[in-house]
Regions:
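N-terminal structured subdomain of primase-like DNA metabolism proteins
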Residues: 1-103
């Protein structure tokens, strides 16, 4: 569990941003999404449109209408309307066990 005294390393944040699959994240959040023509389309948490896709190379989700990008941490903050530490705590379960933070 995250709190104001939790130390989060740069490497751990990099893993959360780069190694959490958006398909898994959307399923975990029960966020509307679908695969269509090789794209992972989702409902934008800001404008509610679906002019969206996920770039697998950069692991960024993008809304072309809003012109916004999200990494998994940013998306979790936007969908749940929570702060950074809460988002990091939510995402830990989506990392493979070997990559989870150790205390």
């Amino acid at each position: 569990m995250m709190n104001e005294r939790t130390i989060i390393t740069r490497d751990y944040l990099r893993r959360l941003r780069n190694e959490i699959d958006f398909g898994n994240l959307f399923r975990y959040m029960r966020w509307p999404h679908k695969r269509q023509d090789g794209k992972l389309i989702f409902v934008c948490p800001d404008c509610s449109e679906s002019q969206t896709d996920v770039n697998r190379k950069t692991n960024l989700a993008r809304c072309f209408r809003c012109e916004k990008n999200w990494n998994p941490i940013d998306m979790t903050i936007a969908v749940y309307r929570i702060d950074f530490l809460e988002a990091v705590g939510q995402l830990e379960c989506l990392l493979p066990p070997a990559q989870r933070r150790t205390e």
